[in-house]
Amino acid sequence: MAQTPDGISCELRGEITRFLWPKEVELLLKTWLPGEGAVQNHVLALLRWRAYLLHTTCLPLRVDCTFSYLEVQAMALQETPPQVTFELESLRELVLEFPGVAALEQLAQHVAAAIKKVFPRSTLGKLFRRPTPASMLARLERSSPSESTDPCSPCGGFLETYEALCDYNGFPFREEIQWDVDTIYHRQGCRHFSLGDFSHLGSRDLALSVAALSYNLWFRCLSCVDMKLSLEVSEQILHMMSQSSHLEELVLETCSLRGDFVRRLAQALAGHSSSGLRELSLAGNLLDDRGMTALSRHLERCPGALRRLSLAQTGLTPRGMRALGRALATNAAFDSTLTHLDLSGNPGALGASEDSGGLYSFLSRPNVLSFLNLAGTDTALDTVRGCSVGGWMTGRADWRAGRGGLGPPAGVANSLPPQLFAAVSRGCCTSLTHLDASRNVFSRTKSRAAPAALQLFLSRARTLRHLGLAGCKLPPDALRALLDGLALNTHLRDLHLDLSACELRSAGAQVIQDLVCDAGAVSSLDLADNGFGSDMVTLVLAIGRSRSLRHVALGRNFNVRCKETLDDVLHRIVQLMQDDDCPLQSLSVAESRLKLGASVLLRALATNPNLTALDISGNAMGDAGAKLLAKALRVNSRLRSVVWDRNHTSALGLLDVAQALEQNHSLKAMPLPLNDVAQAQRSRPELTARAVHQIQACLLRNNRADPASSDHTTRLQPLGLVSDPSEQEVNELCQSVQEHVELLGCGAGPQGEAAVRQAEDAIQNANFSLSILPILYEAGSSPSHHWQLGQKLEGLLRQVGEVCRQDIQDFTQATLDTARSLCPQMLQGSSWREQLEGVLAGSRGLPELLPEQLLQDAFTRLRDMRLSITGTLAESIVAQALAGLSAARDQLVESLAQQATVTMPPALPAPDGGEPSLLEPGELEGLFFPEEKEEEKEKDDSPPQKWPELSHGLHLVPFIHSAAEEAEPEPELAAPGEDAEPQAGPSARGSPSPAAPGPPAGPLPRMDLPLAGQPLRHPTRARPRPRRQHHHRPPPGGPQVPPALPQEGNGLSARVDEGVEEFFSKRLIQQDRLWAPEEDPATEGGATPVPRTLRKKLGTLFAFKKPRSTRGPRTDLETSPGAAPRTRKTTFGDLLRPPTRPSRGEELGGAEGDTSSPDPAGRSRPRYTRDSKAYSMILLPAEEEATLGARPDKRRPLERGETELAPSFEQRVQVMLQRIGVSRGSGGAEGKRKQSKDGEIKKAGSDGDIMDSSTEAPPISIKSRTHSVSADPSCRPGPGSQGPESATWKTLGQQLNAELRSRGWGQQDGPGPPSPGQSPSPCRTSPSPDSLGLPEDPCLGPRNEDGQLRPRPLSAGRRAVSVHEDQLQAPAERPLRLQRSPVLKRRPKLEAPPSPSLGSGLGTEPLPPQPTEPSSPERSPPSPATDQRGGGPNP
């Protein structure tokens, strides 16, 4: 048994490795418990974050004890005998003895290094206690890597800490966190840890990630916004705040925190003296007074003051606000530190009950506040109860001198009430840049005193950039004082003044007209929603006179009733936009409901010289406004931003704007109109998506920077001069060299010691090289502020402008000389000279037409060049570090090879049983580190990549399956008799994995491939497969109807819808009788019937409902109304319907039906579905046309083609009708028309026909209907009636038949299956079959005395055929009628002869039989024994 220097055999080492797999063993030490001696063998296996004490006397191995390094509270080392004592959380004391001091020191170094990775600021003195010898402790300190030489892991070792905590708590390691940290935070240099990035994880995983921040030195901010924190996460946040000294910012907004959390947070901060917290935001959490009192107490005593404090919308009361104000006023550190204070959204916190000792006491002191937000706190903005500013300030000074700032004296709170502007004018007027006092009261008393505090503050302000007074209901005097103070201040520039919703009205408009021109400090003015109305005319004129206003918001002020006044206002705004001297650049008329009035502004954009931003959202201008906007964008080149949401714009309007942006290259920003897009998406989603994508593509094109510059910018990110895989390679190589050094040991001889020293130097140089990369990046990315370079570039731009002007002048002069020489008489007038001077005047601003970013682009190019230089230098440094590490590792490998000749056998048997082979240095390295060897081979084989995109350190799959597991086939796939596809790929080859111990899989036999040219076929391809059958449970109470087997003649032997016919053939309610003619014996014995189509829509949806035809016929309408069968006569609209082409199954039946009477009434009317009704032309009166209306023409793809009437045919029919003189009836028809007006539309048939009972004659103009068929009983002739115009109708029928034959339509001359209908009236007798000319066909079955078909019991062989089966037929075998309608009719309807007249004046006699020639088999009608679904037996 081969023994290693540490006394552990190779077999035992392999057994331990397999026992602890997949965990990686880093160090094995032989040990024993005190008193047992060396006879009792134990091995201490040290992993990365955990130690295992294994009992190795007998196999299998047994774990006697295991503990995490984070459980170690203290360690005590002893040299004689060499032993260590652990103080653990789970065990009070664990003593282990080792064979030598070297093993003891290795254990101490490994545990100390692991603990230091988790706790970077820990020291060896805290970990090792007495009786640890000082000499041993000194050796351990010298051997432990320092922070400068220790390779830096991503984000300050966050992942290592997180992994250690997962091992300590027994939780799985989440790779999502590892990926985010490696890919996002580290590569982008982000020090802001957001819990929202991991909100999809469980609360325990989230709590572990927060706990890993407790001792992290990289992250500076922890934020959680709009996310409810669980109790575990809250506890870890409190623990982190009590331990972390590097976290500077804590943002917990809208996290459902309560006052108890704030109290505990204050306690945690109070107990941590070295806390680095400087920014705190608890906005959106309901904090009670106790929580605010505890936080205020901490803020009052903390040595390090906060820079930012946000307590917006926290439910602060006046008591909590007073406590906070006193804390800020008491701690003098806040005067020079606090710059951002947000207390907005706390109504009543600064109300009338607030005294002078609260927040105003801090604001009145000199401080450095730059951001103050007190919106919605009910604070008084100016003087209350007439108190003067000077007296209030004097009293406050006396009070502060007498009480030292701890509280106001008696009576001060009543005599000196608080004022906001009075306080800030004394305290922070020189440093305040943002003041938001919106939604507050200006004054609580009606005082006529001038608001001196407001005017005083505005005259003293120096750096103010934003003043928000929205919703404060400013009186005219306050507005006048406001503008006067701004007029007196000569220090302010670019101030944004928000006066929206202040109810200024006419008085405020007059003040603004008088003083806005003098307020030169205001560059942006928001006057929205102030009810100006008609005063907008003069107000716009006053705004146009201002020379400082660049942005004006006038929305929600156009509530003008007079249209002329509104037009006047809009035209004044247009003049303001087109004025060359007006500096206005941005205009907002949002939420004004201008509708078509916005078109005036949009037309003005075509000639706009200055406007760069426009907001026209909320004006309901529709698609017309969108089209005008599109036209303006085609010619406008000054606009940079357009906002146009909430305008009722459809997809067409969006598409117009998108197409206009194709020609606009200057628009940079157009926020997506979400409301309009959401509405348009519902109606036309495809067109909307196309328009949105086109808009975004055009904006991206307009904002695209130089591709070379963008490539450099993305490549050279912070901490990214060298790609992360290169840094990872350096770190891995450092680790590999360190492992070689540890493997070499101390007794390696002079050459080994030299190799170790070289390796240590290489590691130190590599770590130092990586540490200077951020310095190189800062040096390369620092902006160039060389004033000489800037002056030269600006001078160069001026020179370019002068050259352009000179070029234009030369071109103009040459053009004039040429024009004068060619046409001197045309240039004698003076008008052309004025026009030419106007054009040349535009060349004065030619330097402004040069690229606006030319100067910035020049500095950007310089920065990119500097980054390229530093990047090249960084790459060379890293390359040198890699070369040094590789050389050191090669030297160590040579030393290991020389040492192996002494400690290991010189030769090993060959794997194939041949002669033993000597080990080369590379083979020895592959023996110890097979994974690294394979990785190097893969790197050598793969092409080199200078800038890899993905880090090699990202292991998204933590577990590696062994080769045996990969090669083992699944039982289902390997079982014989199954359709198993051959497996290919690396998983099927069974290559052994080095990381997976176990016996290697044997080589698989080679597969015999077919010769070239022969296709690869699976061996089970020809195997017969069983027929798939789906057994459906029959419905309760339904008859068991066996499904009909498919016909072989139809070519449907393999159907894909087995079981569908069984489903459709079963009924929930028993049917006793059903109208069905008998089957034709000729059809049964002749051609093979085509399978029937699927019953759809009304035919199958209401299959459980008994049809009306099953009920007995009734002769009296009064006694039994509505159920008697009604005979439906063929109308003129049925004549004009195009007949269908017969199928194969119909030809034989049609040939047999040629022997019957050729009466037109006997022709079977084609049965159309609702969609196919688009081909029918119905003649209805004008009133019926208005009542019914026309449905849109919706057709299916299979219905287009030969069955469609051409427009020319319809025109010919109309000409025929005009020739024969069809007109409206009169006389007795009027009475019948009035009587039957209530029953104009009786009911809809199963195929969508609307039964019309009107007797009114149709107009001469023919209009196609999609779903209406006239069935007027008054139009139906009697048994023997013949009108005088029968010859005319006969001629029309012959012409129609000839027209149909010329178009190639199938002629149906034989008798169709007559459909039994209901009698139209109880007093009218139904015509007999003899009088109607109906043939006595045996296939139709017997008839009753009324000429109706008698009902027949339900056939047992009925079944439903799916649509898929019908589509499998060949096109030649599928009849045209199947293409038109798959709807199954409930019963055939009896066809009546067409009415000879359409009104009462045309007679009531039926047409005589029309003799026709027998048709050919191609034109034969369908057999009566076959229904319209393809020739199957009729039900």
Curated annotation (Swiss-Prot):
One of its GO terms (biological process) is actin filament network formation. InterPro entries: CARMIL_C (IPR031943), CARMIL_PH (IPR041245), Leu-rich_rpt (IPR001611), LRR_dom_sf (IPR032675), PH-like_dom_sf (IPR011993), PP1-Reg/Actin-Interact_Protein (IPR051279). Residues 965-1435 are annotated as: Disordered. The gene is CARMIL2. The keyword Lipid metabolism does not apply. Keywords: Cell membrane, Cell projection, Cytoplasm, Cytoskeleton, Disease variant, Leucine-rich repeat, Membrane, Methylation, Phosphoprotein, Repeat. One of its GO terms (cellular component) is cell leading edge. The N-terminal leucine-rich repeat (LRR) domain is necessary for localization to vimentin filaments. The C-terminus is necessary for localization to the cell membrane. Changing R1023A: Loss of ability to bind heterodimeric capping protein (CP), unable to inhibit the actin-capping activity of CP and to rescue the loss of lamellipodial ruffling, macropinocytosis, cell polarity, and invadopodia-mediated matrix degradation. Residues 1283-1297 have a biased composition (Polar residues). Residues 1191-1203, 1230-1246 have a biased composition (Basic and acidic residues). Residues 972-993 have a biased composition (Low complexity). Forms homodimers. Interacts (via C-terminus) with heterodimeric capping protein (CP); the interaction inhibits CP activity and hence promotes actin polymerization at the barbed end of actin filaments. Belongs to the CARMIL family. Residues 994-1003, 1035-1045, 1406-1424 have a biased composition (Pro residues). LRR repeats lie at residues 64-88, 89-111, 249-272, 274-297, 303-326, 335-362, 393-423, 429-452, 461-481, 492-514, 519-543, 546-572, 581-604, 608-631, 636-660, 664-687. Residues 573-667 are annotated as: Tropomodulin-like. This is Capping protein, Arp2/3 and myosin-I linker protein 2. Cell membrane-cytoskeleton-associated protein that plays a role in the regulation of actin polymerization at the barbed end of actin filaments. Prevents F-actin heterodimeric capping protein (CP) activity at the leading edges of migrating cells, and hence generates uncapped barbed ends and enhances actin polymerization. Plays a role in cell protrusion formations; involved in cell polarity, lamellipodial assembly, membrane ruffling and macropinosome formations. Involved as well in cell migration and invadopodia formation during wound healing. It is linked to Immunodeficiency 58: An autosomal recessive primary immunodeficiency characterized by a variety of infectious diseases, including mycobacterial diseases, mucocutaneous candidiasis, silent but detectable EBV viremia, and staphylococcal diseases. Patients suffer from dermatitis, esophagitis, recurrent skin abscesses and chest infections. Immunologic analysis shows defective T-cell function and deficient CD3/CD28 stimulation responses in both CD4+ and CD8+ T cells. B-cell function may also be impaired. Changing R1021A: Loss of ability to bind heterodimeric capping protein (CP), unable to inhibit the actin-capping activity of CP and to rescue the loss of lamellipodial ruffling, macropinocytosis, cell polarity, and invadopodia-mediated matrix degradation. It comes from the Eukaryota. It comes from Homo sapiens (Human). The modification Phosphoserine is found at S991, S993, S1120, S1246, S1315, S1420.
